Amino acid sequence: MTQKKHSPSSTRWLKEHFDDQYVKKAQKLGLRSRAVFKIDEIQGKDKLLKPGMTVVDLGAAPGGWSQFAIDQVGDKGRVIACDILPMDSIAGVDFLQGDFREETVLGALLERVGPDKVDVVMSDMAPNMSGTQQVDQARSMYLVELALDMCNQVLRANGSFVVKVFQGEGFDIYLNEIRKLFTAVKIRKPDSSRARSREVYIVATGFKL
């Protein structure tokens, strides 16, 4: 059998991934992904997560953010996580596997949230990348719009929102939408985010009902 050759871009990604200090650090610490260092840095600056809070984590797999969040909110807090991909269980995290773009999955997610509002909505979602920037940007903006819709449905007054967004077409319009809904909005580029990546994190606090 002929071994499949990687494209130049995927070969570069693989080399970056295995040489990445944050990947190595995550493996050494037994963490689920390098993404935990991003939310850790955001938490250090913005103090979004506190004991007893209820958190919704969108695009949760493999579970780095959920793992971090449940450690922050503690036994009296709740983390409700959702992803289209499977995720190994985490003590204290209520995980729903499914595509929350589908009405049945969204309904199940809202049912798990229950009648009480949540304190934080966080989203590290990204689409499956096609390699065509225009297509990928449109897909990613669609996902972040859905995450903002989730805020409108479940976030309590003065709640917080942290979302990964790729800079490009639609970014400025989306940022303005968030500014209308929250009292304070910041853009973060964590040190653990690859410099070449267009990703940034919008951190919004003080949700206006």
Curated annotation (Swiss-Prot):
EC number of this enzyme: 2.1.1.166
GO cellular component terms attached to this protein's record: cytoplasm
Enzyme superclass (EC): transferase
Keyword Cytoplasm among UniProt keywords: yes
Keyword annotations of the record: Cytoplasm, Methyltransferase, rRNA processing, S-adenosyl-L-methionine, Transferase
Compartments reported by the entry: Cytoplasm
Binding site for S-adenosyl-L-methionine: G63, W65, D83, D99, D124
GO MF annotation list: rRNA (uridine-2'-O-)-methyltransferase activity
Catalytic residues (positions): K164 (proton acceptor)
Pfam family, one: FtsJ
Function: Specifically methylates the uridine in position 2552 of 23S rRNA at the 2'-O position of the ribose in the fully assembled 50S ribosomal subunit.
Family affiliation: Belongs to the class I-like SAM-binding methyltransferase superfamily. RNA methyltransferase RlmE family.
PANTHER family: RIBOSOMAL RNA METHYLTRANSFERASE, RRNA METHYLTRANSFERASE 2, MITOCHONDRIAL
Name assigned to this protein: Ribosomal RNA large subunit methyltransferase E
Source organism (scientific name): Aeromonas hydrophila subsp. hydrophila (strain ATCC 7966 / DSM 30187 / BCRC 13018 / CCUG 14551 / JCM 1027 / KCTC 2358 / NCIMB 9240 / NCTC 8049)
